[in-house]
Amino acid sequence: MQLKKLSQKQKLYLLVIGLVVIFVLWMSGKLVKKEELHLEEMPIANEELFIFGTGETIEGLSVQEVYTDRGIYHFEGDMDFTPYLYQSIQAVTEGQEILHINNLLQREVRLENCLITENNSDQMCVFTEGFFIWLPCKNLQVQFQNEIADIYIANGSITKISKKKEFVSGKILSIRPEGIELEKYGIVPVSENFRFYKTYGDYEEKTTYELVVGYEPAKLIVAEGEICAAVQEKPISLEKIRVLLKTTDFAEMIHKEITVKAQGDYEIFYGGHRELLKTGEELQLNPQSDYLTENRVILIPQNDTSRLEITSIQRNYGSPIYAGQIEIMKESGGLMLINEVDLETYLYGVVPSEMPASYELEALKAQAVCARSYAYRQILLNGYAMYGAHVDDSVSYQVYNNLPTDEKVIKAVDETAGKVLKFGDEVAVTYYFSTSCGYTTNETIWENGTRENSYISGKLLNDTKKKLDLTTEEKFREFILNETEMTYDSGESWYRWEITVPLEQITENICSIENIGKIKNIQVTERNEGGVVQNVLLTGEKGTLELKHEHAIRVALNGKGQKIRRVYGKDAEGGNMLPSGFFVVDRVEEQGELKGFCFRGGGFGHGAGMSQNGANHMAEAGKSCEEILALFYEGTILSNI
């Protein structure tokens, strides 16, 4: 058959069709490749898993969860793990999901440093990773109760129990990467699979850093020269606090040298030696001192009236004087200084450093409760565990011993002795600050803040109990520019303030963060409860910059050295941050040219929790400590620790 010749038009048509087909195939290939790439990225694997139980056998697991030696896995459908309990399987997994069980394996598994809570002859209850697991055993004749052991399991039953009997106890001096430092033992290494169990009340598993320094919080189980587990059998009575004392002006943690002068007799303990430091005698230490050959010197008072003056540092009233025990440790770069003191005595030094001692007694009592609640939480948080302290003596925690105490402060602390604020069963978070703008705010002003603590919230500080929405620019501007709004703080000089910051200074501040050129505009784009700034957008000649959270915003927009006009009293000078985040901002122009920005605001401090000046004015109006705390921390109760 003779083929017909194609015309030019037909050839062009076929060419176009061919190109379309090629393109479609190419795209299909691309799509297939994308799919293949996606599948390759999914963590599909064959894993060996030991099955300890499912939601049917372990309380706390859902019906679609299984607990293994590699943690909790999920599964879909009606997959049955009953035939595989207390045995090893090979399974196909995708992340933490079991897709398919391949087969049963003959493998022994070890539960390391687990807590045996109880047992009978054919079952043993183990607490590990927050779960109680009943494991089958055969003719077990020994009774266990809250003991640490390694347990070996294979083929559906316990094959071996290796009980760990050796333990040490003693005051924990510090918790470091290289181990736990114990009084009389030094630093003892911690095993890689260390476990810490609380066995009173509800059983809990904790972390190493929840072992509270300065106490003997738990029995420490030792195996092969390492601490492998800890068991806390009863609550700790938190009667003492360990305070890291900073240098003059609270500038540094590390001291080049330390000089102490005894006001009363002290015993000096160092490297197994003991000496007496008598009244009036001085002890001067530097990193090369013979006293520090084993890195630590401890000075213990011989009676309750003995005090140590630290003459190498200065506070507002001169060289500070401390009750309690003083420890000096050699650290990289110099010496570290810690004061271990009774919690109530510590508050004698905190309350006057945080609130003027001349304030009303009921306000001082409220401050004492807040300071005690804060200190209690910080002891448990163990923030300076690496250095053997709970807090330092600066504004990073609570200012301590910066001003002398007096009889009214002692009375306020004593009349509230042992009292804290609680919300439910937990000690409350008790933020406080100097002066409000008339309205407070919540914890989300800070970068990691949440609304978890509902008692820290925005409220109008007067007796009207009015709720105001100050999150809009219009409403907040109306509120903050009203210098006569009657609240508990309205008689304070910082109740309303105004500062103008030149354009050059604002530009320099912002360009030190990010060079966006000369600033052209500042706009508050979001306000939190009470009207405090949450987000600010800065526009420069070279770009824009968004600032978030009140502290960062106050620092960036500071008018250091500029005059601050206050509603009452003398003008003040701007510092390293604006007085508060409760402000509005306006352009300052001359003949149409931008010259700077005017910030008009109210209050002094972050604005969350208790206004100290507001508390004092409430006390002046006849309010009690309980009434003051009920306003600022709504829903909390005053309770014994």
Which residues does each PLM region occupy?
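Conserved, single-site charged/polar hotspot
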Residues: 2-641
